[in-house]
């Protein structure tokens, strides 16, 4: 395995780990209760931490195929979630999805950075790294 692929695998894992720790920080320390769509994004992100870590330790570039699909699904989920938070015509029509509304914004840094935006960014990084790993092998 080339150093470039090794670094991409490590970067993917660190991105997933940071996203997982960030979501746990928001829910367990800041006491933000996750909405249903947040839970879906967690369900997609958390296994990536383990999958990418094992792939990195075993030097198995084939995990990039799994992380590619997980991250693609996560990108669509978080993009939809971000859209119903930020686009007025979607916000008004957003269905109730549990005790916490999916349109709620616990954070809104710089007027556009919300938790689903952070998740989307992490999924995009993992997706790009996975694509690059697949192209290198």
Curated annotation (Swiss-Prot):
Topology term for the membrane: Multi-pass membrane protein
Keywords: Cell membrane, Chaperone, Disulfide bond, Electron transport, Membrane, Oxidoreductase, Redox-active center, Transmembrane, Transmembrane helix, Transport
Annotated family: Belongs to the DsbB family. BdbC subfamily.
Cysteine disulfide links: 35-38, 97-102
One term of GO molecular function: protein-disulfide reductase activity
Transmembrane helix as UniProt keyword: yes
Signal peptide as annotated in the record: none
Gene3D superfamilies xref list: DsbB-like (1.20.1550.10)
TM ranges: 6-25, 40-59, 66-83, 111-133
Compartments where located: Cell membrane
PANTHER family (alphabetical): DISULFIDE FORMATION PROTEIN-RELATED, SPBETA PROPHAGE-DERIVED DISULFIDE BOND FORMATION PROTEIN B
Principal subcellular localization: membrane
GO biological process, one term: protein folding
Gene field: bdbC
Record protein name field: Probable disulfide formation protein C
Described purpose of this protein according to its UniProt entry: Required for disulfide bond formation in some proteins.
GO cellular component, one term: plasma membrane
Pfam families named in the record: DsbB (PF02600)
